Curated annotation (Swiss-Prot):
It comes from Albidiferax ferrireducens (strain ATCC BAA-621 / DSM 15236 / T118). The gene is rplT. One of its GO terms (molecular function) is structural constituent of ribosome. The keyword Disulfide bond does not apply. This is Large ribosomal subunit protein bL20. Pfam families: Ribosomal_L20. GO terms for cellular component: ribonucleoprotein complex; ribosome.
Length: 119
């Protein structure tokens, strides 16, 4: 059985890890052994934060909708309840965008919600 020398594969693996660690500070960016751990940890953070990002954006949308609804004399909770009763199926992302960029349209939605809650 022939002898296997691993110089090429090892160098390729090291290059790959160091490329992923590009921009890291200190030895984390240029020493393979340290960079390997840093890249693994970065991957864990990336995996975790891809999930956290969804929660953070939802919180942001709700905060924006709440602020806009309060300007129109309602709380977010009342507004959400009224949307359901009025069968208005607009998601939070779109509602927050409307609230930020087109307050007149948001006010008309609030008027529809208030009318449905009053009835």
């Amino acid at each position: 059985m022939p002898r296997v020398k691993r110089g090429v594969t090892a160098r390729a693996r090291h290059k790959k890890v160091l490329a992923l660690a590009k921009g890291f500070r200190g030895r984390r960016g240029n020493v393979y052994r340290v960079a390997k751990e840093a890249v693994m940890k970065a991957g864990q953070y990336a995996y975790r934060d891809r999930r956290t990002k969804k929660r953070v954006f939802r919180q942001l949308w709700i905060a924006r909708i709440n602020a806009a609804a309060r300007q129109c004399g309602m709380t977010y909770s009342q507004f959400a309840n009224g949307l359901k009763k009025a069968n208005i199926e607009i998601d939070r992302k779109v509602l927050s965008d409307i609230a930020v960029h087109d307050m007149a349209a948001f006010a008309s939605i609030v008027d529809q919600v208030k009318a449905k809650l009053a009835a």
